[in-house]
């Protein structure tokens, strides 16, 4: 049986959902007035439809900082970019929104989850502990769902 050691041991989407819920419940993430109207990149035509999209993006960015120490806004813009297609021209790769990613990093800094370093952003000890705690909860929930299936007798 595999033992939990860190965030890499859980499925990314499950962790992001759980951590987004944790950020929402904490109430520390300030929601800007432009959250309902902003596009997340030049390639997008509309603002995100999910009302909790900013919590999900914040959780995903926090996970990226956890996995990539020293990540910056430009790397996040590349990660959240997409194909831009004007229908009559060949599509091109575009960058995601710098403002959205920068704002979320600044909010995570205010919350004490990430800190600025020379090469970008890094996770704080408190941020790592907090994320590992949520990841462990996700791991336990997943283990509880999977274990009974393994132990069932075969007929």
Swiss-Prot record:
It comes from the Eukaryota. Keywords: Cytoplasm, Ribonucleoprotein, Ribosomal protein. One of its GO terms (cellular component) is cytosolic small ribosomal subunit. One of its GO terms (biological process) is ribosomal small subunit assembly. The keyword Transferase does not apply. Its main location: cytoplasm. One of its GO terms (molecular function) is RNA binding. PROSITE patterns: RIBOSOMAL_S19E. Belongs to the eukaryotic ribosomal protein eS19 family. Component of the small ribosomal subunit. The ribosome is a large ribonucleoprotein complex responsible for the synthesis of proteins in the cell. Required for proper maturation of the small (40S) ribosomal subunit. Component of the small ribosomal subunit. This is Small ribosomal subunit protein eS19. The lineage of its organism: Eukaryota, Amoebozoa, Evosea, Archamoebae, Mastigamoebida. The gene is RPS19.
